[in-house]
């Protein structure tokens, strides 16, 4: 039996963090007797998340970690290459102030960095209840699970959808 739970008006705003909605839903379900140790927030905009990734994240949560998120390797838009652009004169300068970014001539020399893929945010129910909209609520020691390029596809724009459709056909995904 599927039960529809509508967002209350205070959570139905454009800038409402999704974690606020997840927290509200988990608490409301707990009031009805559906209590869970963990809550997995799996983005529908990341349609290629693998079952084995979800199972791996659940195992990590069961080992006592209170937050596990999916990460992707930063390849092309590396933070060391980020620039600030002066719109008046079109001059640009490095965004990072405390790093000598000019010494990293080749991208292979750049430090290996990761960012959240947006696919999965998994938290203990205890941690989720503490969410206060002042940070991402990742706990003191968040754990990252690196996903491949296909799993990291996140559909936010039309071009992302077109790319996901192309990859789906090319690799016969789902």
Q: Residue ranges of each PLM-predicted region?
A:
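Short phosphate-binding loop-to-helix
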Residues: 1-40, 48-52, 56
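Conserved beta-strand segments of alpha/beta enzyme cores
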Residues: 3, 141-143
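A short acidic, often aromatic-flanked loop/helix-cap motif at beta-alpha or helix-coil junctions
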Residues: 10-14, 75-77, 150-153
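Conserved core of the sugar-phosphate nucleotidyltransferase
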Residues: 20, 24, 47-138, 146
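Active-site catalytic microenvironments for nucleophilic, acid-base chemistry
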Residues: 28, 60, 167-170
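Hydrophobic helical membrane-anchoring modules
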Residues: 130, 144-174
């Amino acid at each position: 039996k599927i039960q529809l739970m509508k967002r209350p008006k205070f959570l139905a705003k454009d800038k409402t963090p999704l974690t606020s909605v997840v927290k509200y839903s988990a608490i409301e379900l707990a009031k009805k007797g559906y209590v869970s140790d963990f809550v997995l927030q799996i983005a529908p905009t990341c349609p290629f998340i693998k079952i084995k990734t979800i199972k791996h994240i659940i195992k990590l949560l069961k080992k006592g970690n209170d937050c596990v998120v999916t990460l992707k390797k930063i390849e092309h838009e590396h933070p060391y290459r980020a620039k600030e652009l002066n719109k008046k004169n079109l001059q640009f300068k490095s965004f990072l102030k405390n790093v000598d970014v000019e010494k990293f001539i080749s991208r292979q020399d750049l430090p290996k960095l990761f960012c959240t893929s947006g696919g999965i945010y998994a938290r203990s129910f205890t941690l989720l209840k503490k969410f206060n909209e002042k940070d991402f609520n990742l706990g003191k020691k968040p754990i990252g699970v690196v996903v491949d390029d296909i799993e990291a596809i996140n559909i936010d724009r039309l071009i992302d959808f077109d790319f996901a459709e192309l990859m789906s056909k090319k690799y016969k995904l789902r």
